[in-house]
Amino acid sequence: LNLKKIVKIVHLEIRKKMNIFLLQNKNKKIVILDIPLLLENKINKKKDILIFVQSKKSDILKKLLKRKSYNPNLLRKFRNIQLPLDYKKKKSQFIIKNNFTKKSVKRSIKKILNSIL
C-alpha cells in the first residue's frame, strides 16, 4: 500500500468525522478545523475561510526531531504529496506567522477572529 492510498483511506474517515462534527456544531458562529492535506484532498468548500500557518523550515524540523515517532522517510513521502506552500498561501484568506510562541499566535488568532466576526 503506498502513501497516497493510505491518505485516501484515512481522509474518508476524516470526512465522516468532520461532517459529524459540523452537524453537531451547526449552530455555532464559527467552527475551526485543523485538517492535514485539506486542499490536497479537496475537503474544503468555497465558503470556508482558510488560514495558512507559516513557520520556518528549521523551526519545524527542530519540533519534528523532538518527536519519538519522527521518521525522515515518511516526512519526505508526505512532502511529495503536498501541494506547494505558495499555492496554499494564495488559497488562504489569512496567514499566521508561527514562531512557536503562544503569545504571538494567540494575538494573530484574535485579529483574525475580530475581522471574521
Residues covered by each model-derived region:
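ATP-dependent NMP and nucleoside kinases share a basic, alpha-helical "lid"
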Residues: 17-67
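ATP-dependent small-molecule kinase phosphotransfer cores
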Residues: 1-27
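C-terminal non-catalytic interaction appendages of large macromolecular assemblies
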Residues: 68-70, 78-85, 100
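C-terminal alpha-helix
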Residues: 111-116
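Short, flexible turn/loop "capping" segments at secondary-structure junctions
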Residues: 43, 87-89
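Amphipathic alpha-helical segments that mediate coupling or scaffolding at interfaces
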Residues: 9, 63-64, 78
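Phosphate-binding beta-loop-alpha motif at adenosine-nucleotide cofactor sites
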Residues: 90-104
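Residue-level signal for inorganic ion chemistry
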Residues: 6, 32, 75, 96, ...
